[in-house]
Amino acid sequence: MDGVTYQRFPTVKIRELKDDYAKFELRETDVSMANALRRVMISEVPTMAIHLVKIEVNSSVLNDEFIAQRLSLIPLTSERAMSMRFCQDCEDCNGDEHCEFCSVEFPLSAKCVTDQTLDVTSRDLYSADPTVTPVDFTSNSSTSDSSEHKGIIIAKLRRGQELKLKALARKGIGKDHAKWSPAATVTYMYEPDIIINEEMMNTLTDEEKIDLIESSPTKVFGIDPVTGQVVVVDPEAYTYDEEVIKKAEAMGKPGLIEIHPKHDSFVFTVESTGALKASQLVLNAIDILKQKLDAIRLSDNTVEADDQFGELGAHMREG
């Protein structure tokens, strides 16, 4: 349509950032962009994960398939995954074999020779590539208990039992299998816009104000110790339950508090599995989203693009 523009200039403000956790604000955009970013982070940012397992010896109580499943779900450091090739696209091995450009080999050999149970963990996997290794959670742990730093348990062996195998990690995305998803949790919420009618609030007694505040299941409101006025303490604690609004109506004060979501402002919470740092996960997702949009813009097959993306696809090709 003439005169319609989709152009926006989103802004990002980081609130909290750790290796495995990020919280940030995404503003000046709409829910379609927020949801697209969330979905890309969960299912389309590539990582490395164990895909093939050749078991040579297994005398543990676990069958081969169970061990292979456990191995596949061990998160691997994947900073290099974006530059590696998918096995089906690898020109050096044609996807039938494996090479350094698309795969990483992990041999494992463990045998229990004492009466004490031997824990076989992710630390017993030896990587052929030092940039792709089982995630070490030691740096993220605040406890000094050494038992917390032994890695992810694969199997337990008793005297005489042995486990020997070769595992092959390949590049993939969460859309194909959850083992390749770098995200433990990705959520976003609308920022609430909370408006208090001060004139109506002044007509309430102190007891009524306390009842109003306590009607909210989360601590959104409080009383200013100096002025005695009801104030917003933590707007993001609001869960859109409308309990405080219903309470105001029950008190005969409709419109006392109005709460509306800001449809162009979102608060994201991102937790990583450890395969990627949370910050890198977000940046990689943005890069992939850009590539998808560029593919629409540069599409030669306009009919196919229009079928898939309709007016938006046509608009982007026109610039």
From Swiss-Prot:
Q: Which InterPro entries match?
A: DNA-dir_RNA_pol_30-40kDasu_CS, DNA-dir_RNA_pol_insert, DNA-dir_RNA_pol_RpoA/D/Rpb3, RBP11-like, RNAP_Rpo3/Rpb3/RPAC1, RNApol_insert_sf, Rpo3/RPB3_RNA_Pol_subunit
Q: Which domain of life is it from?
A: Eukaryota
* N-acetylmethionine: residues bearing it: 1
Query: Biological process GO terms, please?
Result: DNA-templated transcription
Work out whether the entry's keyword set contains Acetylation.
yes
Provide the alphabetized UniProt keywords. Answer: Acetylation, DNA-directed RNA polymerase, Nucleus, Transcription
The cellular component terms of Gene Ontology attached to this UniProt record, alphabetical and capped at eight, are: RNA polymerase IV complex; RNA polymerase V complex
Provide the GO MF annotations for this entry: DNA binding; DNA-directed RNA polymerase activity; protein dimerization activity
Q: Where in the cell is it found?
A: Nucleus
Xref: SMART domains: RPOLD
Its assembly, as annotated, is: Component of the RNA polymerase IV and V complexes. Interacts with NRPB11, SHH1, GRP23 and NRPD1.
Its biological purpose: DNA-dependent RNA polymerase catalyzes the transcription of DNA into RNA using the four ribonucleoside triphosphates as substrates. Component of RNA polymerases IV and V which mediate short-interfering RNAs (siRNA) accumulation and subsequent RNA-directed DNA methylation-dependent (RdDM) transcriptional gene silencing (TGS) of endogenous repeated sequences, including transposable elements.
What PANTHER family does UniProt report for this protein, alphabetically?
A: DNA-DIRECTED RNA POLYMERASE, DNA-DIRECTED RNA POLYMERASE II SUBUNIT RPB3
Q: Which family does it belong to?
A: Belongs to the archaeal Rpo3/eukaryotic RPB3 RNA polymerase subunit family.
Quote the protein name from its UniProt record: DNA-directed RNA polymerases IV and V subunit 3B
